[in-house]
Design a protein with these regions (language model features):
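Non-ligating segments of multi-cofactor redox enzymes
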Residues: 1-217
Length: 217
């Protein structure tokens, strides 16, 4: 995913779309938009920074999970098998971006993710949750011949909801994809490269230094 910080207006449409799509519990946010200030008075500028799971190539959360609940899929998405999660919260401690939440109540809801598909979302109490790039939408789209990052029904909900098209989704392994083009031509950069986790979420912020530290929780 690529997020263009020049386009983001801090409207939180992505946050609301995520909660509606994934029926996350109270106080559980798989994506959030932070606002921060740059510069010094009187030349101060307010900026916005959307945060979500970075789906790292070298994910610390996967490395520390004792039960194998956290795993990396073939497509690079870091996912959680709730049937294996033992609620130890080791992954929450290990994640340097602090984008994992433990849902104490669990949830059960029927969500209409697509016009042609209804699915039941059920989560057990105490299970750790996070952004999964709306993998159910991606899988449904691919199964119906759609291309993630191109067709609406195969995109994460946050991408579709953004009114200014600040988010772009696609295949990082395809050099001809729109997301690869943006990273190359717009100098996409990752948040906290010094962590050495090789995130799959890039930001376009040429000339705008990313904040040194922001926590979701």
């Amino acid at each position: 995913m690529v997020i263009d910080l020049f386009r983001c207006i801090g409207c939180h449409a992505c946050t609301y779309a995520c909660k509606a799509e994934n029926t996350t519990g109270k106080g559980v946010f798989w994506t959030l938009v932070f606002d921060y200030e740059r510069g010094k008075y009187p030349n101060v500028i307010r900026s916005f920074l959307p945060i979500l799971c970075m789906h790292c190539e070298k994910a610390p959360c996967e490395q520390v999970c004792p039960s194998g609940a956290t795993y990396k899929r073939v497509d690079g998405i870091i996912a959680i098998d709730q049937n294996k999660c033992i609620s130890c919260k080791a992954c929450m401690v290990a994640c340097p971006y602090h984008v994992r939440f433990q849902n104490p109540e669990g949830s059960r809801a029927a969500a209409e993710a697509h016009q042609k598909q209804e699915r039941s979302i059920s989560r057990q109490p105490g299970i750790v949750e996070k952004c999964n790039f709306c993998k159910d939408r991606i899988e449904w789209g691919i199964a119906h011949g759609l291309t993630p990052g191109v067709e609406w029904d195969a995109n994460p909900a946050c991408v579709n909801a953004c009114p200014v098209n600040a988010r772009t989704f696609g295949n990082l392994d395809d050099p001809d994809s729109e997301i690869s083009r943006l990273i190359s031509t717009q100098k996409g950069e990752v948040l906290h490269e010094e962590f050495g986790t090789s995130p799959s979420v890039f930001y376009i912020s040429v000339g705008r230094p990313l904040p040194s530290r922001i926590r979701m929780r």
